[in-house]
Amino acid sequence: MNNITLAGEASSITVTGEKVEFVMAVKRLSGFIDYINCSSGIHIMNDVMNGEKITCYGEVRTVNYKGDDEKSHLKVYVHVNIIAPYEGEDKNNVTVQGFLCKEANYRFTPYNREICDLIIASNRNSQGSDYIPCIAWSKHAKRMAKLYVGEGVNITGRLQSREYEKRYENGVVEIKTAYEISVTKFSKWGGNRENVG
């Protein structure tokens, strides 16, 4: 299971052959806007214009790529299967079933909030797996920190974009963006997998 619904404003539409890449700007209840990278076939986008409000249905996907620094990076995006009319409010709802593929990172923020970073491997049928970053707060952070590698979980939340500061040894500070599922609900399920990752 890997399903996401996004409703918001489409922008930065780029067509390359039969592939279309674009960004969905989705407003939270707080007013903050998440900018989510999306990809679809040109036949799905039809005549969608920059600035148009739409609803997208698809899956959270990830792919590794080599950056300018020659290091491997993880791209998180939404593979859009269906585009429908906008229904009057922004939406960002995701449900993913998968396995914890590396040990959870439980810690406290500088403001003393509990936080837990996880990577969930979600099987894509015969096409391999997507390795999806997730972040949990407070009580969810404490509970998810107790998961073991290979344990099956169902996660509900939103796909968010979050800016953070990357500090290098030479003192340079770079603003970067993380894309991850912010967990609002989770449960364990009977699946488990040995040697995940």
Language-model features, listed with the residues they occupy:
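Single-stranded nucleic acid-binding surfaces, predominantly the OB-fold ssDNA-binding core
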Residues: 1-197
